[in-house]
């Protein structure tokens, strides 16, 4: 996921401040995920794992999901094409998938926020971390479609503006 993020950042980074902020937030989320999946159970029963690391991941997770749903998705659509966009079919397909994905991810958040992970629950927790990794990967693929669409639209608009300016001169 980090490699795909790096590749996407190289392709579209710098094309729009909103996209750059979104990609930066994704990187922070991925770093916290990588940190949390490295957590191992302690030797003593009922000794919690690094709760701060899990708390940080859950916090980043909610922040990332919230900014996408309540800020970024709508702004991208409005800035790029407007409400009457012919590409609204793309967003009409992606948005429900993102909504379902959010429910999956929030179920993890609700289950593992403020809980102690001990040896008895460690296997379940490790499986949940694997599942959340798959859910994040699926989400990022959907979001990448929006990002690519936005980058292409902004580039086309810049080319059209450049053509207009060259025709005036």
Swiss-Prot record:
One of its GO terms (cellular component) is cytoplasm. GO terms for biological process: regulation of DNA-templated transcription. It comes from the Bacteria. Keywords: Cytoplasm, Transcription, Transcription regulation. InterPro entries: Rsd/AlgQ_sf (IPR038309), Sigma70_reg_Rsd (IPR023785), Sigma70_reg_Rsd_AlgQ (IPR007448). The keyword Transcription regulation applies. The keyword Cytoplasm applies. It is found in: Cytoplasm. Belongs to the Rsd/AlgQ family. Interacts with RpoD. NCBIfam families: PRK11718.1 (NF008723). Binds RpoD and negatively regulates RpoD-mediated transcription activation by preventing the interaction between the primary sigma factor RpoD with the catalytic core of the RNA polymerase and with promoter DNA. May be involved in replacement of the RNA polymerase sigma subunit from RpoD to RpoS during the transition from exponential growth to the stationary phase. This is Regulator of sigma D. It comes from Yersinia pseudotuberculosis serotype O:1b (strain IP 31758). The lineage of its organism: Bacteria, Pseudomonadati, Pseudomonadota, Gammaproteobacteria, Enterobacterales.
């Amino acid at each position: 996921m980090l490699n795909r993020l790096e590749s996407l950042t190289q392709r579209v980074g710098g094309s729009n401040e909103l996209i750059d902020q979104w990609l930066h937030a994704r990187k922070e989320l991925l770093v916290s995920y990588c940190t949390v999946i490295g957590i191992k159970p302690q030797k003593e029963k009922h000794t919690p794992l690094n709760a701060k690391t899990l708390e940080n991941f859950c916090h980043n997770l909610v922040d990332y999901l919230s900014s996408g749903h309540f800020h970024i998705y709508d702004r991208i659509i409005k800035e790029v094409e407007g409400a009457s966009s012919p590409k609204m079919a793309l967003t009409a397909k992606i948005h429900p998938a993102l909504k379902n994905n959010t429910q999956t991810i929030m179920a993890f958040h609700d289950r593992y926020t403020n809980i102690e992970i001990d040896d008895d629950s460690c296997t379940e927790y490790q499986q949940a971390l694997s599942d959340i990794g798959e859910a994040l990967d699926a989400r990022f693929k959907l979001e990448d479609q929006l990002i690519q669409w936005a980058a292409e639209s902004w580039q086309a608009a810049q080319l059209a503006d450049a053509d207009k300016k060259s025709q005036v001169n």
